[in-house]
From Swiss-Prot:
Domain of life: Archaea
Organism: Desulfurococcus amylolyticus (strain DSM 18924 / JCM 16383 / VKM B-2413 / 1221n)
An example Gene Ontology biological process: DNA repair
Gene Ontology molecular function: deoxyribonuclease V activity; magnesium ion binding; RNA endonuclease activity, producing 5'-phosphomonoesters; single-stranded RNA binding
Family label: Belongs to the endonuclease V family.
Protein name (database record): Endonuclease V
Length: 219
């Protein structure tokens, strides 16, 4: 049986209602208590999807472990449904890490999504783990300038922030799941390094998926 796109959209709408209802009860996260974070990303080679997850020491910003695996993309790329294409391989890669991260960073959006259920929210909800969406381009929502901050409003809520990187470019940080926006932005800022367009865990996951994973998997 083929992929049911209408059902996927309906599922996003149903689950996003639950997440938005929980938004104000998401806990604050004390940065001093964060031990490890994970970044996930994927690349494609000859029709094969290569997913990678990197576990990183949060304070030292040093990689602790990485995993990678291949999969056939379950569906083509469809705007708004990226989670159904890439989340399965990310979740499998995360399960293969030697320890569960305190926070997951995803190359993509969270609540700043047309149905408030981007890939970062999808993964965070499935794994019951705080998650953050980080993207180089906007997807959904209006930017409002408040006290010098560029906040992203969508679905009647502030769900993201435009953050300037060390390079002077902008990235779009959004709430995924189980994290407040202020904490998500603080985590992302801590993990940015000079010369990088995305936080270090995502950058390393991207590199692994494009180089070491391909060599190890002999693609």
């Amino acid at each position: 049986m083929g992929f049911d796109y209408q059902r996927a959209v309906m599922l996003q709408r149903i689950l996003s209602e639950r997440v938005l209802a929980e938004l104000d009860s998401f806990p604050r996260i004390d940065p001093s208590r964060i031990r490890s974070v994970a970044g996930v990303d994927a690349s494609y080679r000859g029709g094969v999807q290569v997913g990678s997850a990197v576990l990183m020491d949060y304070r030292a910003k040093m990689p602790l472990a990485y995993t990678c695996l291949t999969s056939k993309p379950p569906i083509p790329y469809v705007p708004g449904l990226l989670a159904f294409r890439e989340a399965p391989v990310y979740i499998k890669a995360l399960h293969r890490l030697p320890a569960k991260p305190d926070i997951i960073l995803v190359d993509g959006h969270g609540l700043s999504h047309p149905r408030a259920f981007g890939i970062a929210t999808h993964i965070g909800l499935v794994l019951s783990t705080p998650s953050i969406g980080v993207a180089k381009k906007p997807l959904y929502g209006e930017v409002e300038e408040v006290n010098g901050r560029k906040l992203v409003r969508a679905h009647g809520r502030i769900v993201g922030e435009v953050v300037e990187t060390n390079q002077g470019s902008e990235i779009y940080v959004s709430i995924g799941y189980l994290i407040r926006l202020e904490d998500a932005v603080e985590v992302v800022r801590h993990l940015m390094e000079p010369g990088l367009k995305l936080p270090l865990p995502i950058h390393l996951a991207d590199n692994y998926s494009r180089s070491k994973c391909i060599k190890e998997l002999r693609l």
